[in-house]
Amino acid sequence: MRELYIKNLCIEITRRCNMRCTHCMRGDAESVDIPLKHISNLLRHVRHIHHFNITGGEPSLNVRAIRHILERVRAYGITVNDFYIVTNGSATSRSEEFIEACAALYEYQEEKEQDSGHMLEMSDDRFHDPAEYAATLAALSPYPFFGVRGQAERIFLFREGRSTEGFPNPVHGIYLTEENYVYGDLCLNAEGMVLSNG
């Protein structure tokens, strides 16, 4: 059965991170990468994804999973309107393998111009290293899929993990229509659990 149309899909590909940001909603990094079989098991039921968010931890630490996602959406013929990844701007986000994987995602997605931002965005806030920021900005700026998240002044945070400020993380319902359209934010976490929020 490959009938699902998903409005918002988020896959947490890793819980590893190379920073310890005080605002991190994920909490302490864990040495956990999503088993690739969980990605395949979910995507084999999907026909169309409007917005596909690849998250972590730091996504650039698990390029293998990003490549697997691209391989599966191609193999299953899944239409993806747009992908979205946020990086912390560390050295791994400047790696050739990460940039190549992002370029391949960008080529695959249907929409090249996104109203809400770019396919790959770097956090631009008071929590990240300015030296890393400058080096990553220089390395990634030439790519059409890259942009800065643009929230240096105001950051919307949930009060979870190490974050001591912000709002409670809301839990939203997931709804499946008779036409197999999934409404809501569907999230596959690194442990293989399907959740209604990230």
Where are these regions (language model features)?
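Accessory C-terminal segments flanking Radical SAM cores
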Residues: 163-198
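A generic structural motif
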Residues: 82-85, 117-120, 144-170
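Active-site beta-loop-alpha junctions enriched in small/polar residues
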Residues: 57-59, 88-90, 125-127, 151-161
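Hydrophobic transmembrane helix bundles of membrane-integrated enzymes that assemble
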Residues: 23, 138-144
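Acidic (Asp/Glu)-rich catalytic clusters
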Residues: 42-47, 72-77, 100-115, 137-140
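Conserved alpha-helical substructure of the radical SAM core
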Residues: 1-87, 92-97
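Non-cysteine beta-strand/loop elements that form the S-adenosyl-L-methionine
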Residues: 111-128, 149
